[in-house]
Amino acid sequence: MSAKIALKSKVQLGIVPTHLRFVGCLLPDENGRYPRNDDGDIIVVAGVKELCEISPVKFTHVQVSFFPGTAREEIDAVVHGLKSLQLEVDFVLMVGGVNPMNPADEDAVVAQLLPNIEAAIAHGARSVSSTSIEEWMSTNETRREGADFEAAIAQNVKLHLRAMREAGIEGSCVESWHIEFLRPGEFKTFTSLERAWAFVSAANKALGRSFFKLLVDASHCGDSGLTIAENEALIARIAAAGELGIFHASAKTTRGCLSSDDGWIGAILTAAAKTGELRQVFVEIFDHADPALEALRNVEPGHGVDTRDGRTYTEVMADGLADVAHRLNNLAARGIIKD
């Protein structure tokens, strides 16, 4: 890394390498193997290495999506490759084609979660994260309210505590599980900080400790329908409860260049910093033409806008890292982030 910008606080900076695409990079093939380049290198590792080489700031973490059906030796190869770049690897536990809110799908959801939790433990991961509280882009679901919403929370608590127990998380290296809500359209029920926090709070109450955290993604906050002020107030309450988790610096609607965020990253990041509980910030950018996200573009055309402005996506990520590094340093300079 060229590391021209030195971080001036203890907040850890990382990336989510979705800018490399799901199709052709993060998604394994039918044999559970990752795509490789002409040199035989796993593309996600090669892509992150390129970013390390051009980034003006040293980042220390990478949050990788691991899908059900990925061969264990392939996961091992990705983790070892990323660790060789002096990066700590955080596991994103992906699930698909199943509904965590439906009791009939509980066994299937747990079966998808377990192998990657076990891999995370084997590799010494200190945190895992997931959106495993609802099915992505479901065409069968309607928004759950009232008693139906409470039932969805209860089922999710049952499912996630079962996954913890069966994977042997208690007493392992995994210190926290970060739950991410998604914008309306991607989800129908858990579509805001407030609604996702209801699950996190219930899960921790059932467990007896604050193990589950709420991942705060600036883009989803911006698209959730709540105002900046409403999100700021919720973040303060979530942090006071000991349930504030990882922060994603990502632009609302476009999910592209951070300059397209309409002010949301700055406002939500500052709100998290003011709590004194901000620990990790990850820059997340998506390729606007990723075939895996076509369904989302059909729901929200703004997701298909090309915000690169003549750059490659790796260059857009490098600029995003610089942007967030300066934000963190200036939050520290103003005394908002305190060490």
Mark where each language-model region is.
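Acidic/histidine-rich catalytic cores of soluble enzymes
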Residues: H61-V62, M164-G266
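Short acidic/histidine-rich active-site segments
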Residues: Q280-A289
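Active-site groove signature of glycoside hydrolases
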Residues: A120-E145, E170-G185
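Acidic-and-aromatic substrate-binding clefts and catalytic sites of carbohydrate-active enzymes
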Residues: N37-I43, H61-A77, G97-V109, W136-N140, ...
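Alpha-helix-loop-beta-strand connector modules within alpha/beta enzyme cores
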Residues: H80-G96, E150-I169, W197-K205, T270-K274
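A short helix->loop->beta-strand "cap" motif at the edges of active sites that frequently abuts
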Residues: L85-L87, A125, C173-E175, T275-R279
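N-terminal pre-domain/capping segments
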Residues: M1-A122, G208-K213, L244, E300-D339
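Active-site cleft segment of glycoside hydrolase catalytic domains centered on the general acid/base Glu
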Residues: T139-M164, G185-S192
